[in-house]
Amino acid sequence: MEVMPQPLTIVILAAGLGTRMKSRHAKVLHQAGGKTLLQHVIDTALELAPAERIFVVVGHQAEKVRQSVTTPGIGFIEQTEQKGTGHAVLIGRHALAGLDGHLMVLYGDCPLLRTETLRRLIAQAAEGPAAGVLLSAMMDDPYGYGRVIRDSRGHVLDVVEQKSGTPEQLAIKEANMGIYCFRAGLFWEHVGEIEPNNPAGEYYLTDMPAILHRAGHTVEAMRIDDPAEALGINDRAQLAEVDRIFRDRKRRAVMAAGVTLIQPETITIDPAAEIGQDSIIESFAQILGKTKIGENCRVGSCSIVSDSTLADEVHIGAFTIVTTSVLEHGVHAGPYARLRMENHVEAGAHIGNFVELKKTRMGKGAKANHLAYLGDSEIGARVNIGAGTITCNYDGFKKHRTGIGEGAFVGSNSTLVAPIDIGEGAYVAAGSVITNPVPPDALALGRARQEIKEEWAKKRRKLAKT
């Protein structure tokens, strides 16, 4: 049975710029798997400790990093000079030293760490006498990683960095992953002994195992099977690889829950998205943000559904974009439709090809099957919107509302100049420009009367020849 130390304090190191990213943005602000690298690590930490026991060390672009964190209650410690990982923790001593229990150190650019792995690390730290436990992995090529030096009993004596190791030490395949869980009291007692004895003049947290060993304490290492789990991101290629891993994890979880993905490797599903059983997501679709999709739905190829809610049996045709909208049971949208923002489409309604909705409510069974723009509108149940209909909702200064009552029929190529209301059961003749309210059950015609001029074309052609 796992033993979880209580309480646990977590420090996340996120002060670096990440020069190899070749970016104007701090490294931890880059996104993989639908969230910033830092937010991934924070979300993992929240599975282990309350927000008030989680602290982020910030440095480069400190204010932007603070603002990027979506979790209330997280503490921040500013490292104005980046002098190494040991220094990053040491400057938080006044804020953290009074917190007993265990202290875990994580990195803001290591988003792939699983909660289960960290629980095992914490349990090992709690069960035994060790002053600290570090995470390690066996690697075929550990170049660039610190090597874990053990004694005959398997205890950690030291972590030797690539630049300072002897050939014998560098031949060791066990690499330090840089994740630690210390007994807080012993850590704060000895962390001040770290010295900048390296060409960079920095204070390295990797010195702590040797310091604790010299003080007569035991340090252990817990090996993980997959080194990629603790992969830190240093450049764009690694960022892309981590994003791929996140996407693959999510796709596998979705399929395990009963969702069919057609060509799954082409599909993007964000971590917070939810998809119901027996739904089908076609190739190259993107399910983004906090989208919730019900059961027996289908999302067509190359469609994008973002921060929206789809009830059961909703069908999204290919190349359709749905943003911050609600689609009730049995709605059909697309192909090539756009539900731009804040729309609510009631049960059984149809939004056809090349139809755009913006801040519009469509009633039950309403239909706009072809080539229409409906903005800032309230459309009643069973309304039929003909092809080419547009609501003229903007007068150059303000947006205006269009209301269409239940059972109304709007003919093709109609222009509805808002603000305007069309009553229940009313008809709008095709080609009309409607500028005044239409009473219920009335017929509105707003077009020029057709005129026929016999033989006009024949005379025009004859004239052109002269």
UniProtKB/Swiss-Prot annotation:
Give one GO molecular function term: UDP-N-acetylglucosamine diphosphorylase activity
Q: Where does UDP-N-acetyl-alpha-D-glucosamine bind?
A: 13-16, 27, 79, 84-85, 107-109, 146, 161, 176, 234, 340, 358, 373, 384
Q: Which UniProt keywords are given for this protein, alphabetically ordered? A: Acyltransferase, Cell shape, Cell wall biogenesis/degradation, Cytoplasm, Magnesium, Metal-binding, Multifunctional enzyme, Nucleotidyltransferase, Peptidoglycan synthesis, Repeat, Transferase
Q: Pathway, per UniProt?
A: Nucleotide-sugar biosynthesis; UDP-N-acetyl-alpha-D-glucosamine biosynthesis; N-acetyl-alpha-D-glucosamine 1-phosphate from alpha-D-glucosamine 6-phosphate (route II): step 2/2; Nucleotide-sugar biosynthesis; UDP-N-acetyl-alpha-D-glucosamine biosynthesis; UDP-N-acetyl-alpha-D-glucosamine from N-acetyl-alpha-D-glucosamine 1-phosphate: step 1/1; Bacterial outer membrane biogenesis; LPS lipid A biosynthesis
CDD domains attached here? GT2_GlmU_N_bac, LbH_GlmU_C
Q: Which cofactor does it need?
A: Mg(2+)
Return the annotated region ranges for Pyrophosphorylase. Answer: 1-236
Q: Where is this region: Linker?
A: 237-257
Q: Where does Mg(2+) bind?
A: 109, 234
Q: Which reaction does it catalyse?
A: alpha-D-glucosamine 1-phosphate + acetyl-CoA = N-acetyl-alpha-D-glucosamine 1-phosphate + CoA + H(+); N-acetyl-alpha-D-glucosamine 1-phosphate + UTP + H(+) = UDP-N-acetyl-alpha-D-glucosamine + diphosphate
Give the EC number(s) listed in the UniProt record: 2.7.7.23, 2.3.1.157
What does the record say about how the cofactor binds? Binds 1 Mg(2+) ion per subunit.
Provide GO CC annotations from the record. cytoplasm; membrane
Q: Where is the active site?
A: 370
Gene Ontology biological-process annotations: cell morphogenesis; cell wall organization; lipid A biosynthetic process; peptidoglycan biosynthetic process; regulation of cell shape; UDP-N-acetylglucosamine biosynthetic process
* Subunit structure and binding partners: Homotrimer.
Its job:
Catalyzes the last two sequential reactions in the de novo biosynthetic pathway for UDP-N-acetylglucosamine (UDP-GlcNAc). The C-terminal domain catalyzes the transfer of acetyl group from acetyl coenzyme A to glucosamine-1-phosphate (GlcN-1-P) to produce N-acetylglucosamine-1-phosphate (GlcNAc-1-P), which is converted into UDP-GlcNAc by the transfer of uridine 5-monophosphate (from uridine 5-triphosphate), a reaction catalyzed by the N-terminal domain.
- Enumerate the PANTHER family for this protein: BIFUNCTIONAL PROTEIN GLMU, NUCLEOTIDYL TRANSFERASE
- Protein name in the entry: Bifunctional protein GlmU
